[in-house]
């Protein structure tokens, strides 16, 4: 099993190209099930989750064609992939594959909309809380579907003639459920209005792609999304938006290690709240023509309190990384997690490096320390794993992170990008 070895104490200086967003690419890939034409996606990151979803889509009848091999050029990290689903050959999404990645459960929306029925395993993925599927079930039921849970599977059936447009308001914001109901509603009869919809940029990206395919969606990026159903969707060509979580992660890495790094192929508008929080912590961040510049030269790290919230609030997917940064602050900070109920699994691993963190319910109190010391640590989930890498960049001596398959699910060639900026980071294969 691979490990990541980090020797701390080196500033980061250089250029890091940001990959396409995993959280946008996955629903965009699943949208290929809605049409018999070819959907071409540019800027698709090379990640374990993307590879797994390609296998899952292939089982449903999607032909996947990748444009050549991944180029080893400085600015070439992501790929162009063509998805063609002439006929859906299997409406069952098996436990064997779906249990490995929660987002693969989202095929339930397009399969139900296009075929009128499907059998989809309950999901797996990161071990963060319970992450129930109730919101998905309620949203699709509002469109007229009947949903039955049997032996770990959901048997879904649309009414005769297909799904029916409706008004539905989510009791709580859910990005995944917004994706699924929006995709399903594109082929429903009549108009669907989704209330309390997720406002994340990835939702907007999916809506833009669906509109390019012939859907009629308005309001994406607000709390109310309106979808006028159409009889069919066509193919399209769409570029996956930059990964705001990867952007924020590397910005926090620079704030932690110090240095001066340009993040290319990204957009400051994608994460205003997180970047403003980083500025308060002492980072110097400015927009460039094709991204942003992040600097922290000499100044210490200031303590800042955060509360995670749905977009445009502070992203839960950057919570662990920010906590790692706060371990080196000059005072006491607090991190409150409101999205997931069990997203502090990285705390005990950061403590192995010398961090002082105490938990009280959904709030972590972090007392900044003058130094961290390298040690063997273990990744517990995707975002927690990269927080350990960030901490290792500033720790004295050597830090080794095991179970890095979590990293490979969401960060494209992380060790290569950091090494190019002066970090001592290497992958050790065993």
From Swiss-Prot:
CDD domains: UdpNAET
GO molecular-function terms, A-Z: UDP-N-acetylglucosamine 1-carboxyvinyltransferase activity
Principal localisation: cytoplasm
Enzyme class at the top of the EC tree: transferase
Catalytic reaction annotation: phosphoenolpyruvate + UDP-N-acetyl-alpha-D-glucosamine = UDP-N-acetyl-3-O-(1-carboxyvinyl)-alpha-D-glucosamine + phosphate
Sorted UniProt keywords: Cell cycle, Cell division, Cell shape, Cell wall biogenesis/degradation, Cytoplasm, Peptidoglycan synthesis, Pyruvate, Transferase
Subcellular location: Cytoplasm
GO BP annotations listed: cell division; cell wall organization; peptidoglycan biosynthetic process; regulation of cell shape; UDP-N-acetylgalactosamine biosynthetic process
Amino-acid positions noted as binding phosphoenolpyruvate in the UniProt annotation, renumbered to this chain: 22-23
GO CC terms, sorted: cytoplasm
Disulfide bonds: none
Keyword Signal carried by entry: no
Enzyme Commission number, as recorded: 2.5.1.7
2-(S-cysteinyl)pyruvic acid O-phosphothioketal PTM sites in chain numbering: 126
SUPFAM superfamilies in the cross-refs: EPT/RTPC-like (SSF55205)
Transmembrane segments: none
Domain of life: Bacteria
Pathway(s) served: Cell wall biogenesis; peptidoglycan biosynthesis
Gene3D superfamilies: Enolpyruvate transferase domain
Protein family membership: Belongs to the EPSP synthase family. MurA subfamily.
Protein name in the entry: UDP-N-acetylglucosamine 1-carboxyvinyltransferase
Organism expressing this protein natively: Rhizobium leguminosarum bv. trifolii (strain WSM2304)
Gene: murA
């Amino acid at each position: 099993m691979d490990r990541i070895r980090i020797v701390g104490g080196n500033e980061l200086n250089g250029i890091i190209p940001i990959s396409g967003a995993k959280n946008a690419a996955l629903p965009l890939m699943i949208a290929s099930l809605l049409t018999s034409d070819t959907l071409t996606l540019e800027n698709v990151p090379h990640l374990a989750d993307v590879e797994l979803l390609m296998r899952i889509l292939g089982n449903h009848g999607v032909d996947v064609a990748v444009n050549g091999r991944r180029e080893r050029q400085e600015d070439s990290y992501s790929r162009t992939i063509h998805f063609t689903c002439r006929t859906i050959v299997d409406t069952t999404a098996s436990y064997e594959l779906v249990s490995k990645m929660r987002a693969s459960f989202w095929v339930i929306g397009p399969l139900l909309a296009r075929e009128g029925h499907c059998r989809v395993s309950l999901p797996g993925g990161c071990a963060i809380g319970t992450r129930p599927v109730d919101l998905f079930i309620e949203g699709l039921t509002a469109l007229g579907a009947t949903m039955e849970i049997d032996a770990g599977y959901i048997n879904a059936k649309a009414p005769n003639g297909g799904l029916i447009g409706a008004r539905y308001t989510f009791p709580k914001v859910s990005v995944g459920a917004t994706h699924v109901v929006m995709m399903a509603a594109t082929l429903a009869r009549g108009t669907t209005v989704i209330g309390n919809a997720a406002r994340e940029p990835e939702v907007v990206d999916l809506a833009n792609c669906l509109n390019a395919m012939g859907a009629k969606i308005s309001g994406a990026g607000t709390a109310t999304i309106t979808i006028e159903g159409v009889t069919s969707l066509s193919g399209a060509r769409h570029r996956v938006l930059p990964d705001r979580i990867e952007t924020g992660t590397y910005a926090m890495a620079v704030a932690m290690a110090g240095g001066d790094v340009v993040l290319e192929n990204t957009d400051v508008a994608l994460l205003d709240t997180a970047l403003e929080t980083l500025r308060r912590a002492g980072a110097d961040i400015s927009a460039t023509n094709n991204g942003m510049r992040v600097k922290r030269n000499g100044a210490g790290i200031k303590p800042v309190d955060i509360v995670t919230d749905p977009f445009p609030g502070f992203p839960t997917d950057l919570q662990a990384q920010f906590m790692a940064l706060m371990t080196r602050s000059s005072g006491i900070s607090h991190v409150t997690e409101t999205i997931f109920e069990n997203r502090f699994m990285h705390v005990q691993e950061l403590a192995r490096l010398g961090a002082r963190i105490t938990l009280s319910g959904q709030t972590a109190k972090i007392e900044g320390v003058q130094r961290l010391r390298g040690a063997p640590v273990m990744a517990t989930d995707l975002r927690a794993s990269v927080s350990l890498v960030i901490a290792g960049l500033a720790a004295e001596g050597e830090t080794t992170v095991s179970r890095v398959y979590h990293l490979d699910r969401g960060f494209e060639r992380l060790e290569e990008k950091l090494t190019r900026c002066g970090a001592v980071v290497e992958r050790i294969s065993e």
